[in-house]
Amino acid sequence: MRRIALPVFAVLSMSLLLPQQLAGAAPAGVSLAGVAAVDDPPLAEGDFLQVGPGLYSTDEQSFEIYETDVADGLMSRSHSVTAQAGSVAKPESAPASRPDMGVFGPGWEAEFVGGQLNRKLEEKANSVVVTDLDSNVAITYTLQSSVDYPSGGGVKKYVTADGDKLTETTRFDEATGTLVATASEVVGVTAPTADEDQSADTDATAAIGTSELTPAYTWKQAAPGADSWRVTGVGNVAVGSLSTATYDTQGRISTIQEAAVGENPAQSLAVKYSTATTSTSAALGEFAGRVKEITLTTGATTQTLARYSYDTSGLLRSVANPVEGTEPVSSYAYDSTGRVSDVTSPSNGDWDLSFPAESAVPNVEPIGPARPSSESVFTGAADITNEAAVAPPATDFTTGEISDPQSYPRHCNRATDWMWYLESGCAAWAAHYGWHKPYWKQTPTGHWVVGINNDGCSTPGPNVSKPRGFNFRSACDMHDYGYGLIGNTYKGYKYYLDRNKKSNVDNAFYTTMKTYSCNAYFITRRPACKAIAYVYYKAVGWKGNPRNGANAT
């Protein structure tokens, strides 16, 4: 959701600086007391409401649909509709100077790597300004020191009022005979406060792994034109978990590389673009300059995981996953203003939308069965609502492990069917360092997800569920539930999420932090929140394994 640019030193009202609590009472099984008391960041004004397939901000008067086409690498995009003074609400499009964000056509903004690449760097006289293009927040880094090299170039160091650091290095390149500038940006999480309850944490007596919780960005002048700086790496330097990006000559994303870390092999995502328009009035097809497909290479295996189709006006109309079949997994229709009026989405469901008068909040009608309501009684596996039960009944186990590539029940084939309880019957015990029942959990925006009661956010040393005060506890409890559902396959428990859904569980974890947690905080605090959310996401990607929790059950 891009807004009018705000500087990080914007003056806050005293009401925003007072302690604030999550709206609504916590249901049975929900505990927020396990998180240590820290100075919470100021909350956003207004409310965030789940409206059909998207999220509506009452303060910003903006509605956003967030879609992820490829879970690996968080290859995502967003469609935002914002109210206009004295006119109809209009969809937002990518800035003209950012071809990398406009590759899905009008009304959509690319959010590759979960939107972490959508940042802008501008050099001023004695400062550097980095703008988060999602929230349109400008972060000012003030010059602290500089050193010149005898051969040309040098090093300049900058810092923000919050202690975030940026270093720009310029060196003479003998091969090209030019000065080449790069930059590194570090978002500080100095002295994070550990959770009060560490009873389920096996390394609670060790030092807090601050360096492993610290987000970092690398930058390079990789695009043509005045707006030339691009993020070329994002993640955590201490554990070598940077996602690296390359760009083509037009400044569009070319590849996203993931280095081999832990048990995970190296991966490479390639974004391919159409060179000609093939769509006609009779059939959808390619559109010149738009994304054609996204492929994933792991080892010697390359798969096309997303293929896009457009109409003759260049509007995105459908997305297919060739690995699953030729039929679209997502499809869209638009009204005369370019706003999505019909959506079919694996994660957001099937909906009809209409925008009344000048409002940005749509009227929505579900297509097909309605979703279960939040805080409703779970249906699914036996004894999940039995307070006296401590494990699944013996009759629900088979002999040996389950390697079936499809989840059971069969209609619960998406990670979010369980973790957000989108389908009735998609609830079960979870094998994650013991048997756990599912409970409703509330995120800082008031959104309801499903998780277990265990150890919160697993981090090096004592667990930290509120880094820099941002509350990720519900997202972490939900992620533990997702891993436990996959872990059920190792225990022979007949209710499970299939093993190839790990990246989907991790993707839902990131979305729950980025969209349903970070948006709760005042707009100037969101860039830091999202950066830390990405580090938490990267950590479970390279370190997390559902088998571990199952083996300990």
Regions found by a protein language model. Name each.
Residues 1-29:
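Secretory targeting and sorting signals
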Residues 145-165:
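A short, surface-exposed interaction/processing loop segment used at functional sites
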Residues 26-151, 362-365, 370-397:
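Short secondary-structure "cap/edge" segments that initiate or terminate local elements
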Residues 130, 182-184, 189, 234, ...:
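Beta-strand-dense domains in secreted/periplasmic systems and polymorphic toxin scaffolds
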Residues 67, 75-81, 123, 141-147, ...:
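Aromatic-rich beta-strand edge motifs centered on tyrosine
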Residues 286-290, 297, 322:
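Extracellular beta-strand-rich, repetitive "passenger/adhesive" scaffolds
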Residues 387, 392-553:
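Extended terminal accessory/targeting regions
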Residues 70-74, 132-138, 161-167, 191-192, ...:
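Glycine-centered tight beta-turn/hairpin loop motif at sheet-sheet or coil-to-beta transitions
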